[in-house]
């Protein structure tokens, strides 16, 4: 006599209901796109921001000799096996995540030490919105290396809100900070370096350029350039 097997039927309808009730997680970039107009209008309501310039800052030859030292709240690290000198704020002002947004500053090779002297008061400023940055040790790179002819400074931007978002105030401070860096270099008649093919910049930026390192690569391309120019963070910096 054949044994009757129980009829087991999986109720897929109930699974579909559960799945449909789970909200789709937006990426940090998508959230920034969705909030673009709000942030754009809020940024324009803030007055000009004036950064307190740090005093008693090290010069370029000093940081090339340091191994690890604390200066103006920044830990400076210079390892012999690295072509970069790294600076990281001990108590970060922005508590969010790094979502790939960064700036390069490109200087003529022979003027990098002077450019550092001009910018160091801002880079070490307690008002600086940049918690982490690095600079090329020019003694360790070849004449024509990518970070020898340009992109000697890298400024890393961190978010300050939940879900890796930026507040309008932080975006405003970053915009103003970039303007100060540019104007200080221009006023001192520093010669620009070769800005990276991987980056984008508006016509009025002579030294600073932008890249999101999570959605681009170092080689660059027309497609990548177009994509970076459409990045909401970049647009909020220049528009």
From Swiss-Prot:
EC number: 4.2.3.-
Residues making up the signal peptide according to the UniProt record: none
Annotated GO MF terms: lyase activity
Group of enzyme by EC: lyase
Active site, per annotation: 104, 134
GO cellular component: extracellular region
Major subcellular location class: secreted
Keywords: Lyase, Plasmid, Secreted, Virulence
Localization per record: Secreted
Protein family according to the UniProt entry: Belongs to the phosphothreonine lyase family.
Functional note: Catalyzes the removal of the phosphate group from the phosphothreonine in the mitogen-activated protein kinases such as MAPK2/ERK2, MAPK3/ERK1, MAPK8 and MAPK14 in an irreversible reaction, thus preventing the downstream phosphorylation of histone H3. This epigenetic modification results in inhibition of the transcription of a specific subset of pro-inflammatory genes, and ultimately to a reduced immune response against the invading pathogen. The diminished immune response enhances the bacterium's ability to disseminate and multiply within the host.
Name listed for the protein in its UniProt record: Phosphothreonine lyase OspF
Gene name per UniProt: ospF
């Amino acid at each position: 006599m054949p044994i009757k097997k129980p009829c087991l039927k999986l109720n897929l309808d109930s699974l579909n209901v559960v799945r449909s009730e789970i909200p789709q997680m937006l990426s940090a970039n998508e959230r920034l796109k969705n909030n673009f107009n709000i942030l754009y209008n809020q940024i324009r309501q803030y007055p000009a921001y004036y950064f307190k310039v740090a005093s008693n800052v090290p010069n370029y030859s000093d940081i090339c000799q340091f191994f690890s030292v604390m200066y103006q709240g920044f830990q400076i690290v210079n390892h012999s096996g690295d072509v970069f000198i790294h600076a990281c704020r001990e108590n970060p002002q922005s508590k969010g995540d790094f979502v790939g947004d960064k700036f390069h500053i490109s200087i003529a090779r022979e003027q990098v030490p002077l450019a550092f002297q001009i910018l160091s008061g801002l880079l070490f400023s307690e008002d600086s919105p940049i918690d982490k940055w690095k600079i090329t040790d020019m003694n360790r790179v070849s004449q024509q290396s990518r970070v020898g002819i340009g992109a000697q400074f890298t400024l890393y931007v961190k978010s300050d809100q939940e879900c890796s978002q930026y507040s309008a105030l932080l975006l405003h401070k970053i915009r103003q900070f970039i303007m100060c860096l540019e104007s200080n270099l221009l006023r001192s008649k520093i010669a620009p370096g070769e800005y990276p093919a991987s980056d984008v910049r508006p016509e009025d930026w002579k030294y600073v350029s932008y890249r999101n390192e999570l959605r681009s690569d170092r080689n660059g391309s027309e497609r990548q350039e177009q994509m970076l120019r459409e990045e909401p963070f970049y647009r909020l910096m220049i528009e």
